[in-house]
């Protein structure tokens, strides 16, 4: 879970920075914001640029945000088991060996991130290692490996790029209409209105668009559960989810939340990056 909210937050920050740059480009080049074709091209460049920059930064940012410690050489039997389990599952799934890390947190969680199937990260909380059985922890790891094998990070980035493009385009299109009505106040005032309205609308539309990315995240969780069931058996995956029902709420934030094993509770399922555990368990039982 930690993975998705961090990805979304990073993406939003990058898009806002790029939006400021886009306004500077307009000012320096004299390009008219009202040019629909030019605006659409610029929105796509900056929209996809923000998403892919977030993806490329995801491993380092994820490790830094949780204080993760990469396991290069196992220091104990638990770390040795963790490395060998991830290695075995990666071979089964046909992906390169991910970087494996442990981070200190009381909740039972794990997440995967990374720009490529052969250059990814799997991080596990100490709470998961201390409170789950080996079979349950193995299922959680298989879930994260399945996220990587399914290419969920890249497809999420592509979806976010499309969403960003429309957010930037619609925000600036509407801002141009609003600013045009105040053109009698002078060109300087006109640009300030355009800049202010476009930034506010990007925040509003970005929030509304997050419902789309959260829906996609929930959809991919079912696929990752199914992939884990193929790797280790559905009974282990069901046991892991049953254990999570008794555990604490996730402490993961940002983009990592979407690719964790579980997420935060919410009053509405629409605001959740993960489906309710009951639905995930039912889906596995019906396989």
Curated annotation (Swiss-Prot):
* Entry EC no(s): 3.4.24.-
UniProt KW Protease keyword: yes
Gene Ontology biological-process entries: proteolysis
Q: How does it sit in the membrane?
A: Multi-pass membrane protein
The cellular location(s) given in this protein's UniProt record come to: Cell inner membrane
GO cellular component terms listed in the entry, alphabetical order:
plasma membrane
Annotated InterPro entries: HtpX_protease, Pept_M48_protease_HtpX, Peptidase_M48
Molecular function as annotated in GO: metalloendopeptidase activity; zinc ion binding
Instruction: Kindly give the PANTHER family that the UniProt entry links to this protein.
Output: PROTEASE HTPX
**Known Gene3D superfamilies for this protein?**
Metalloproteases ('zincins'), catalytic domain
The record's annotation in HAMAP family points to: Pept_M48_protease_HtpX (MF_00188)
Coiled-coil portions: none
Q: Which family does it belong to?
A: Belongs to the peptidase M48B family.
An example Pfam family from this entry, by short name, is Peptidase_M48
* Encoding gene (name): htpX
Which spans are transmembrane here?
Answer: 4-24, 36-56, 158-178, 192-212
Catalytic site = 144
User: Main subcellular localization, coarse class?
Assistant: membrane
Residues that bind Zn(2+): 143, 147, 221
The note on the cofactor says:
Binds 1 zinc ion per subunit.
Q: What is this protein called?
A: Protease HtpX
Organism of provenance: Vibrio cholerae serotype O1 (strain ATCC 39541 / Classical Ogawa 395 / O395)
Q: Is Metal-binding included in the keywords of this UniProt record?
A: yes
Q: What cofactors are annotated for this protein?
A: Zn(2+)
Keywords of the record, alphabetical order, are: Cell inner membrane, Cell membrane, Hydrolase, Membrane, Metal-binding, Metalloprotease, Protease, Stress response, Transmembrane, Transmembrane helix, Zinc
């Amino acid at each position: 879970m930690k993975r998705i909210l961090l990805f979304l937050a990073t993406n939003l920050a990058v898009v806002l920075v790029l939006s400021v740059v886009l306004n500077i480009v307009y000012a320096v080049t004299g390009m008219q914001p009202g040019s629909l074709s030019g605006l659409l091209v610029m929105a796509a460049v900056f929209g996809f640029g923000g998403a892919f920059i977030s993806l490329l930064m995801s491993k380092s940012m994820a490790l830094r945000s949780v204080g993760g410690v990469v396991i290069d050489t196992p220091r104990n039997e638990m770390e040795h088991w963790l490395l060998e389990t991830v290695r075995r599952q990666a071979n089964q799934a046909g992906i390169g060996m991910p970087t494996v890390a442990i981070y200190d947190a009381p909740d039972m969680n794990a997440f995967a991130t990374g720009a490529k199937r052969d250059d990814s990260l799997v991080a596990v909380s100490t709470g998961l290692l201390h409170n789950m059985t080996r079979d349950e922890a193995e299922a959680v790891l298989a879930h994260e490996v399945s996220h990587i094998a399914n290419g969920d990070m890249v497809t999420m980035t592509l979806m976010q790029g499309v969403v960003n493009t429309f957010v930037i385009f619609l925000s600036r299109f509407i801002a141009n209409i609003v600013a045009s009505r105040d053109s009698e106040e002078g060109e300087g005032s006109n640009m300030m209105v355009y800049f202010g309205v476009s930034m506010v609308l990007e925040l509003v539309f970005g929030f509304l668009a997050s419902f789309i990315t959260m829906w996609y995240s929930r959809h991919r969780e079912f696929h990752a559960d199914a992939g884990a069931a193929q790797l280790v058996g559905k009974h282990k995956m069901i046991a892991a989810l049953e254990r999570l029902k008794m555990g604490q709420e996730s402490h993961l934030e940002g983009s990592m939340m979407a690719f964790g094993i579980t997420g935060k509770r919410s009053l509405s399922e629409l605001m959740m990056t993960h489906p309710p555990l009951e639905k995930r368990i039912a889906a596995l039982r019906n396989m």
